Amino acid sequence: MPRDALSFELQLSAGLEATEHKLDMLTRLLRRTHVAVKHPLLASRAFHTSPALRAIDMAKVDTTERLAELRKLMKERKVDVYTYISGFTGSAGYAVVTHDKAALATDGRYFNQAEKQLDSNWELLKQGIQDVPTIQEWTADQVEGGKVVGVDPSVVTGADARKLAEKIKKKGGEYKAVDDNLVDLVWAAERPARPSEKVIVQPMEYSGKSFDEKVEDLRKELEKKKSLGFVVSMLDEVAWLFNLRGNDIPYNPVFFSYAVITPTVVTLYVDESKLPKEVKDHLGDKVAIRPYEAIFGDITALSKDAFEAADADATKKFLTSNRASWALNKALGGDDKVEEIRSPIGDAKAVKNEVELEGMRQCHIRDGAAISEYFAWLEDQLLNKKATLDEVDGADKLEAIRKKHDKFMGLSFDTISSTGPNGAVIHYKPEKGACSIIDPNAIYLCDSGAQYHDGTTDTTRTLHFTKPTDMEKKAYTLVLKGNIALERVKFPKGTTGFALDSIARQFLWAEGLDYRHGTGHGVGSFLNVHEGPIGIGTRVQYSEVSLAVGNVISDEPGYYEDGKFGIRIENMIMVKEVETNHKFGDKPYLGFEHVTLTPHCRNLVDMTLLTEDEKKFINDYHKEVFEKTSKFFENDKLTMDWLKRETAPY
């Protein structure tokens, strides 16, 4: 590693890696080695809440001493650019520090949160805002004059590495892979053991397709591509392909693993102690089991053998996902021997079969009943019993209610239980001892979801228990109109989520309002609650993948006023073929089927803003909600009365 000028770029999942133990060990290493580090927070919503995260609130973190120590050490080490701990706890961010600057980049979901948490030492780069540089541009601007930016290749994609390398090269710098991961050196022998939770089988009654069929389908894709094989690196893709589920990653039923599929061999890389007898019986002798740690050595040898064989075809390559790490690409021999593509497994996984679709329908009935029971309880506690409840109390109660329902396996993300101004923090996470008391006179936003053996849920409802302001009612109704419009749209086959995004925003736009997040994300079947490659929004990737029959996706427009309130309404919708009077271009036309079954808040609806057609749509929806969920409340008068009131016709 060159000593003249180095920045070390480290990317890890906040959900996987941000633990109290790691932060403590990082601090010890800083004192010991005079080095400071910060990882960009990339990831997804976490499955279980770590003690460290529970200790974090939304207050500013004074980083003056940290930065002073870091800059002193940077001068000693002749380091010009480094990443560092900023005090920001959002799940998507990137911090970079130079001798005289410190910047953190994040997207619109976290502008509010970052402004609350970052102290005056930091420049906030609001990604996506006009004239604000990307973090890559900002980083490249700091390395003029031959400086070196180092990266652990196992935590960046090949595409991201190439893009940043090009930017740095144009500035006269160098971007290179560094073998050692600083966090791994920090932990050393004190690093916590990798989770050893047992893997379970996702049976045919829920998966609807055998893993043999899925492997055969993948091999057909490999044949079309004339490929030597496919390295599976996304955990949810491994789980889906083999009809297995795990519990290694908070809220996501996956397990640490890789897989390699060639035309003749299927190999699963996993700690074999995690596989009980029923899993081994399920896999049989069709799948070779290799240690998780063997993946890089094995694929290096596999590639070498393939390209050095006497009958080797120089035109054939190995395939990896375009979301796979740069390290996988390098282990297979680099760009000349690897083609990075949108994963065919990801594409197949996003198209649910009839068994999976029916599972989504059924789990949302149970989940909708749980949410209604919670809202009825919460209203009674706040208005009738005058109880004092904080946001965590609410989230815990909702989880307890969900646990009573059949096939419940856990939450699908941390419940966003937010009152008043906290609702404006789009990915708000309440912490016991640092959260707010639920105010019955303020808007309450609840975004929550669960994992069931037959499906995954994600529902957001916004409530007001007393008298909302005119602006709150107007904003809520505009969001509701957008939610309905998106669900009701019909579109030709081949349409992307990028093309549909404005349908949900149109009523807000007409008033000069908007929201800084996507309108929809794909959802797994007892898998990750955020699932690609589909989505509805302005991300470039959403313009590259057409929506297809069998996709399950969220419909979640919103509106937020910093320091005041947040509004979001989220339903799960499934793509289906629909009838139209004409079929221009002889194309099938598609539409959506909702599966979420939770009432909208009557108290927040401004009836004067709804058309008669929209009122009928809501009435029909509420009738369905009552018919499908009221059976759970035959002996629960409180919830039954609440449900009857909330689903009564307008």
UniProtKB/Swiss-Prot annotation:
Gene Ontology MF terms in the entry: metal ion binding; metalloaminopeptidase activity
Cofactor binding comment, as recorded: Binds 2 manganese ions per subunit.
The keyword Ribonucleoprotein is assigned to this record: no
GO cellular component, one term: cytoplasm
PROSITE patterns xref list: PROLINE_PEPTIDASE (PS00491)
InterPro entries, per the entry: Creatin/AminoP/Spt16_N (IPR029149), Creatinase/aminopeptidase-like (IPR036005), Creatinase_N (IPR000587), Pept_M24 (IPR000994), Pept_M24B (IPR033740), Peptidase_M24_C (IPR032416), Peptidase_M24B_aminopep-P_CS (IPR001131), X-Pro_aminopeptidase_P (IPR050422)
Top-level taxon in the UniProt lineage: Eukaryota
Reactions performed catalytically: Release of any N-terminal amino acid, including proline, that is linked to proline, even from a dipeptide or tripeptide
Any one GO BP annotation for this protein: proteolysis
EC number(s) stated in the UniProt entry for this protein: 3.4.11.9
A Pfam family of this chain: Creatinase_N
Residues reported to bind Mn(2+) 1: D458, E556, E570
Keywords noted in UniProt: Aminopeptidase, Hydrolase, Manganese, Metal-binding, Metalloprotease, Protease
Top enzyme class: hydrolase
List of residues binding Mn(2+) 2: D447, D458, E570
Recorded family membership: Belongs to the peptidase M24B family.
Purpose of the protein: Catalyzes the removal of a penultimate prolyl residue from the N-termini of peptides.
Protein known as: Probable Xaa-Pro aminopeptidase P
Organism in which the protein naturally occurs: Phaeosphaeria nodorum (strain SN15 / ATCC MYA-4574 / FGSC 10173) (Glume blotch fungus)
